[in-house]
From Swiss-Prot:
Its cofactor is Zn(2+); Co(2+). PROSITE patterns: ARGE_DAPE_CPG2_1 (PS00758), ARGE_DAPE_CPG2_2 (PS00759). It comes from Campylobacter jejuni subsp. jejuni serotype O:6 (strain 81116 / NCTC 11828). The gene is dapE. NCBIfam families: dapE_proteo, PRK13009.1. Pfam families: M20_dimer, Peptidase_M20. Zn(2+) 2 binds at D96, E127, H340. This is Succinyl-diaminopimelate desuccinylase.
Amino acid sequence: MNAKEFLIELLKFKSVTPNDDGALNFIAMELSDFEAFFIEKEGIKNLLLTKKFNDEGEHLAFGGHVDVVPAGEGWKNDPFEPLEEEGFIYARGAQDMKSGVAAFIDAVKDVSFKGRRLSLILTSDEEGEAKYGTKAVLEWMKEKNMLPDYAVVAEPTCVKKMGDSIKIGRRGSINGKLLIRGKQGHVAYPEKCINPVHDFAPVLKLLAGFDLDPGSAEFSPSKIVITDIRGGMGVCNVTPNDLKLMFNVRNSPDTSLEDVKSYVEKICHGLNYELELKQSSEAFLTNIDNKIVQKMNESVQKITHEVPELNTKGGTSDARYFAKYGVKVVEFGVCNDRIHAIDERVSIEEFEKLCLVFKDLIENF
């Protein structure tokens, strides 16, 4: 089947995270000339497809996920019965990211590759906890001395036009929970209470929206963003016993968890508080002079006639795991204007260009 037909079939699988619904077996059968390894951990199914081309040279990998977020109600069609209409395919996962997966599967068919090995790393655990997916496959590859040198993750990266954005890194994510302790009491006798809201009020303006670093050419500033704040029992005559606050920092490599801790400790000096911090993902950056960045840039410009912005914007992705294992990685895919949305759709023209970009990258790597 051709690339579009394969994409339509792939979109029919109800692969709501972490269930692949048979999609990985379907992919393995499509690429029967690749050696297939099904790697399972904690009930999560992953697939490594790999093919040796030469005894020497570099190992290039493509990464992606077949799991999708729940579809919800209000669609113009059954979200797992793809609808082709006016140049688009409507289905859950059309942009995020079955189009990317279908594109690199099409690209590796009957391709000429001067390197040593091509691999495809696929998981059904990205949209959920993402603990036993790509990371587990890379750990398995490390144990077998099979780690790739370079990788492309086919996440939907483009914003307004196909070809306008390549991700060369991602910010990390630090989650914070702050508990300010007080002493509950009658609102008419504030002198007998310790009101944590009043105590924390002067500190709030020092925390909310604070930039922990000035940013750089590649990264925006590491900003503290408050996501939740609550205290009291929802009544007007009792002061709160404590105040609970949650925040997130999307951090660049210039700001660490320890930097966040030091700043919060400094501004909360004198308060009775508890602080809990957790790094849910780490920041990474692939240098713009690296081969994978240069070659991807060349292929994107050649096929799309756009000059892509090399950036680190957006949330986290599985690319961070490649970076953690020392693999030089970039991300490129179709536009992301409908990801996780009702009536998610992908432009057929964008998808066809993505197939060509990946094939050109492989043949000229």
